[in-house]
UniProtKB/Swiss-Prot annotation:
It catalyses: GTP + ATP = guanosine 3'-diphosphate 5'-triphosphate + AMP. Keywords: ATP-binding, GTP-binding, Kinase, Nucleotide-binding, Transferase. Disruption phenotype: Decreased growth rate; growth is almost completely restored in a triple relA-yjbM-ywaC mutant. This is GTP pyrophosphokinase. Changing residue 264 to G: Wild-type growth rate, this enzyme probably has no synthase activity but can still degrade pppGpp to ppGpp. Its EC number is 2.7.6.5. It comes from Bacillus subtilis (strain 168). Activated by the cyclic di-AMP (c-di-AMP) receptor DarB in the absence of c-di-AMP. NCBIfam families: spoT_relA. Residues 552-567 have a biased composition (Basic and acidic residues).
Amino acid sequence: MANEQVLTAEQVIDKARSYLSDEHIAFVEKAYLYAEDAHREQYRKSGEPYIIHPIQVAGILVDLEMDPSTIAGGFLHDVVEDTDVTLDDLKEAFSEEVAMLVDGVTKLGKIKYKSQEEQQAENHRKMFVAMAQDIRVILIKLADRLHNMRTLKHLPQEKQRRISNETLEIFAPLAHRLGISKIKWELEDTALRYLNPQQYYRIVNLMKKKRAERELYVDEVVNEVKKRVEEVNIKADFSGRPKHIYSIYRKMVLQNKQFNEIYDLLAVRILVNSIKDCYAVLGIIHTCWKPMPGRFKDYIAMPKPNMYQSLHTTVIGPKGDPLEVQIRTFEMHEIAEYGVAAHWAYKEGKAANEGATFEKKLSWFREILEFQNESTDAEEFMESLKIDLFSDMVYVFTPKGDVIELPSGSVPIDFSYRIHSEIGNKTIGAKVNGKMVTLDHKLRTGDIVEILTSKHSYGPSQDWVKLAQTSQAKHKIRQFFKKQRREENVEKGRELVEKEIKNLDFELKDVLTPENIQKVADKFNFSNEEDMYAAVGYNGITALQVANRLTEKERKQRDQEEQEKIVQEVTGEPKPYPQGRKREAGVRVKGIDNLLVRLSKCCNPVPGDDIVGFITKGRGVSVHREDCPNVKTNEAQERLIPVEWEHESQVQKRKEYNVEIEILGYDRRGLLNEVLQAVNETKTNISSVSGKSDRNKVATIHMAIFIQNINHLHKVVERIKQIRDIYSVRRVMN
C-alpha cells in the first residue's frame, strides 16, 4: 500500500476502468470534475494544489477496488468542509448515498468547544455514528488519513506528533479491527517515524544490515518446503515477509528486549487453493522442523472477528532460530490484506446473501456503537470506545463451546451481558473452568465460563457498573435501573448533585435556580431536570459532572479572587512599571498590569507559543510553555496563572530568543556543514552547536539558535528538513 508516487486523476480513473463499467466510470469522472472546480485556487501546506489530496484518496480506494459511490466520496470528501458546497448540492448533483458518505467524514463546524480535545472527540463520535450506518464511511476516512500521513512532513512538528498519536490510538487499531492490514501496517510504521524517529531509523538500519542473511535463510526454508509440497501434488505460492517496523518496536518495548534479541523478524507465508491443503502443508512444516509449544494458532477453525483466517505456527528453523509460518488459501489472503474492503469491493452480480452474511459479521461493531451513543460526553465516548474496539482481546468459551470475544480485563458480568441482557440481569454467580469465581474475576483466553442465574433475582447491583469493563454491559445495567426505578433515581440523583455542590462549598440557593438547572440539562441533551437527575441516579452521568456545570460561573469567580489573593501573598506589592515604559519580556498577566514577568530558561518560550505563568516566591511570574514538564506537576498546578503575549507595539524591542533544536540524520561526510549553511541562509544566529553519532550511523546534532518568533523557528526547521539524509528536526527543552 505504501506509495510515494503522486497519481493524476487520469491515472486513477484508468485504474478504475479495469473493473468498473463505462456508466460507473462516467459517474466517477463527474465527481472528480466537481471536486476540481470546488477546490480551485486552494492549496495544501506543501504548496501543491489541494485537489491533489482528493485524487490520492480516490486512488487508494480504487486500489481497494471500491464501488463507484465510495470512489466519488473519496474525490468529494472535503468539499463540504472546505468549500461553499453543501450536502444538498451533493444530493442533487450525485445521490443521497454519496452525500451521506461525505457527511460521515465531514468534521463538525461552526460550534464552539471548550478545548481542541473535546472538538476532536465530537468529530470522531460523528464519524463512528456515520460508520455504524455505512462502513464505507471509515474506508474513505482511512484512505484520507493514509494520504495525510504520507504527506505529514509538510506540517509543524507539534502537529505531526498529534496526528501520529491519534493515528496509533484510533485509525491503525480501527484498520486492524476491520482487517485492512495493508493500511494498518503503513499507518503504524509512518506514525512511529514521526513519534520516535531515532528508534525507527535504528530498526531500519539494523534490518538493512541483516537483509542478505535473512533472504538466504528464507530461500533455504522455502526450497525445503516446496520440495515436500510438490511431492504430494499441492500447488502453493511462497513468500518471505519481514516483520513491520512498528511490530518489532512494540515487541522490543513490551518484552524489554534489544533488537538483536528479537529472533522472529520474518515470517514465511504459504498460499494454497483449499482448506484441506492448508492442514496438509501444516503437517509437512511440523515434519520438517519442531513446533514451539504454545505457538500454534488455528484461525481457520476459529476466525478473528475481523474475518481473518489463517494457520499460524512457529517452529525451530534450520539454524535453530524461531521461524513463524502462516498458511492460508488465496481467498483468505485477500481478506487478510483488505479485510472489510474486500467484502465491499465492487463485483458485478454480487449475491444478496453474501452482503447479508457480511453485515451479520459486523453486527458486533454496530452493537458497540449503539451502546456508546448513550454517553453524553464525547471524550468519555471515545475513551470507552477505545476499550471496546481497540484494546487487546481475550477469547473465552461458553459451556457449549461457542467462542466469545471480549476486551482484555473483562469479567463474568461482561460475558453474561454479551450472551443476553436477561441472562445478565438474572446473574447470581459464575464458574470459570468448573470453579466458582467472584463477579470481578478477570477472564483469560481459553477460559470456559458458565453463568449461574436465578429467576428470583431482583436484577443487577448498582456496583456492577463499576465492575463491568465493556460498554455493552454498562449500558444494559443502566437501562435496567432506568426502566425499573425512575422516581427513585430522580430523588437519588438530586440528592447526589446537591451533596456534590455542598462539597464544592457553594450555597444551593445560589446555584440551583430554575434557569441554571435547565441550561445545564440542555448542555447534557436532557429535555428536563428530572431526566438529568434520573441519569445521575442510574449512573448514566456522574453527580460531579452535573455539579461542575451548575457551579461553572461561581467557580470562575472564586478562582479569580483566589488568584489575586495568591499573587498578593507570594509577590507582595510589586513595583509598578514606570509610566510609558514597555515590557522587555513581551508578556502580561491577564487582568493584572504591574507584575514582574520573566521568561523561563527551562523551555525558552517565544512569541507565538502557548504559554502559562507560574507564580514564584518573591520573583514575580515565570513564563513557561504550556507543554513544559515543570508546570505539569500537581504542586505547580496550584500556582499557575493565565498570561498572554503582548502586541509588538507594547513591547520594548527584544530581537532574539534562545531556542534549542535537535537534528537527527544519516551520519555522512559534510552533513553538519550543510546544516550550518542552511541555518545561515535563514539569517539566524547560532550560539552553540554539538554533535555525535551512534554505531548505527545516526547523527544527532544539538544546536542553540536565536530567533524572533515561532514563525522564524518554523522557517529554520523547514529549511533544515530540506537537506538530504535528515530524519527529523525538533525543538527541545533544557
